[in-house]
Amino acid sequence: SFTPDEVCTLTIEFYRRNYIEGLFLSSGILHSPNYTMQLIYETLYKLRTEFHFQRYIHVKAIPGADQELIQRTGFLADRMSVNLELPTAEGLKKLAPHKNRKNILAPMRLVQSKMAENQNEVAVYRNAPRFVPAGQSTQMIIGATPETDFQIINVAESLYKKFELKRVFYSAFIHVNEDEHLPARTGDGPPLLREHRLYQADWLLRYYGFEAKELLSEKNPNFNVLVDPKCNWALEHLECFPVEVNRADYHMLLRVPGIGYKSAGRIVKARRMGTLDFTDLKKMGVV
């Protein structure tokens, strides 16, 4: 493992050579959660104060570490994340019984509450220090345990609502060793296309006004890897189409395959000036 000084030196050298524009700092547990979190804090403190590194820093909060340590680190970082590891508590208990779901969620709740508190401080005192101004995120491993896509996007939706996360990252499971609790090795490799569909669905949850229950259900629990989730929704809701672009509201326009939030905004703005036709849509890049 690297010492705080070594991480700082490497970061500055790479930055000066234009190899990097920021730092993502993570760590396994060394000795104890507090010991590890202290090392992370010292690294960020040195980077910010001694090396005057003011670029983007994304850092991991260590579950089980002292709240004060996490808070002090948060004032030095731009973004902080806690890995959820696996989508469900059952999966975590099966593959990582030494880890506790409550311990993972606790620092998430701490970061959320501290962010809200800090926003009030900044509103009153303009020069107050910022606490993780880029928000918090998490990551889930996909394919190591038998959760369906429906379960996974429901977990993501819940995290966005309850913890106000900025991003949920999905990582396709890669076999590195054999274990009776892991899925059998196949020649197909990591489920990268499934990971891609989950990212597309996640985008629909965050920016397009979809809910998890609209995209999948217990009867239809997994995405079609051959069709993107938005197009799949449209195929299952043909009663909603065709859509009249001159009358449909912004939220319905967002549900039309091929129309993104920028195009939907352009349509709503342009139709105030008159009726739109195919040529108008083509000029806007919608078709």
Residue ranges of model-derived segments:
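Long C-terminal interaction/binding lobes of large macromolecular proteins
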Residues: 132, 139, 150-163, 191-194
